[in-house]
Amino acid sequence: MCRTGRQNGTAVGVVTAVDISEQRLDVLRENMMRLKLMQNLTTVCADALSYTPSEKFDIILIDAPCSATGTFRRHPEIMHTKTAEDVRRQEKLQRSILQHAANFLTPGGMLLYATCSLAKAEGERQIKHFITEHQEFAVFPITLAGTENLRTKEGFIRVLPQRFLPKQPNTDENMTEKNMGRPNLTKKNMPDADQTGKDMARAGLMAENMAGADGFFIACLQRKI
């Protein structure tokens, strides 16, 4: 979470990092001290669903807890251990975090939402549901240089691990479980596995220079003034 402040008459960004794990915050503080960036950082050990700041923020980044199915290139066991129930449980938690965090964003502020999940239920559908329920928010298309081949038609960023894509031309006919190289990647293990793969291939979302990357999803929303 970030808000604008003033220091010696100069506008500066003030970052508040909230995490339920004190251990992860210790690692963050250690890194920030090494980089000499602690002066503008406040850390808070709290549950994201109960944290209530005294001031609102201009930017909020939600690195949401998720099924982590996008990391299966490095952790192939995930596709054998994760279930549809795991995805549904994370989807419910993500929705609650989004709704709570939205209360603390200033008008015109930006809300960024990110997961390392391949499931649309934790990405595209999660955001579409949110903006339907919260019409004071709108999608702010991500147009950063270098992301041209990673953008969806809605303005989100969606990246898939390279091995998730077939070696054949990216057509719906070739985007099968067999060609994706994961026969166990089924709707039983991950809802929308087939359709996610098809949608991503159709939109041309895997850039050649992203080889070796995990799968992830990013959306940017803006609160209307």
Predicted regions span which residues?
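S-adenosylmethionine
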Residues: 1-225
